[in-house]
Amino acid sequence: MVTTLLVAVVLLALIFDFINGFHDSANSIATVVSTKVLTPFQAVLWAAAFNFLAFFLIKDHKVANTVAKTVHENFITMHVVMAGLIAAIAWNLVTWWFGIPSSSSHTLIGGFAGAGMTNAIFMGVNPLTAVNTHEILRIAAYIVLAPLIGLVIAYVITIIILHLFKNSRPAVAERWFKAVQLVSSAALSFAHGGNDAQKVMGIIYVALVASNVITQGQHMPDWIPLACYSAIAAGTMSGGWKIVKTMGSKITKVTPLEGVSAETAGAITLFMTERLGIPVSTTHTITGSIIGVGLTKRVSAVRWGVTINLIWAWIITIPISALVAAAVFAIIHYL
């Protein structure tokens, strides 16, 4: 049954999706802006277009299915979904304000799981029974693996490109790579849209199940993907300039050649994990790729102080969003 609460939760989910877009737009445009291939305004329009293009080409929704299964059905209520979304939105806004490229994906999953576990406590059962530990552990593993995969792929691609173009004139090579970077940034934006919009699709799906509008296992209504891809593309168009600065220059200085390597590595990693149905962080992935590029110069080319601060932000994202969601759920429960 469609209720005011369901409408409010769907709107909250789309607000989160929009915030995810402007929070994570930096991931897909940072290198193309820092190399001056596109202006910031051109870059966000470019990224938003390819975010939305994923709606037409990605139809399996494997990532959405994984997100929907992170909390067991009998522990999911509308208040659980609402608390998880409020926590995720709050942490995303905090990290955006301070220019910290944390993971919107893990914020959402942490909030959803934290609210579900708190509901289990109020039901008088072990909170761990509320979550699908297999899926949670799989997601947790890729918190580490996704940036490492991006790092290795970017390192290898950069070494290969440097070898192939070692005799080319620098000015000619730079012009060529600036053109190619339009393609690599488009691929990264497409992969970002395909991966991140699905996470919100999964949340809206479980909200509809909890409201008895649809049953578990029923086909996802067509309006959900359309709304989610539209929201993330609109958010991307609004930009996130604080994070662009961190991603595009504070980790390591990036040339057009290196931008192509980082974006290609990030896109490959995101395409691979999407096929596996694993909701990974675009932020973590592209950061690992940029570090991989920096390592081809020398270890000191990577600004490890900034990188370590980012890693700490990643580590605390799921626990903090889970705790905030637990507090929000408790407040809603007692109101």
Explain the meaning of each model-derived region:
Residues 1-335:
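Multi-pass alpha-helical transmembrane bundle typical of ion/small-solute transporters
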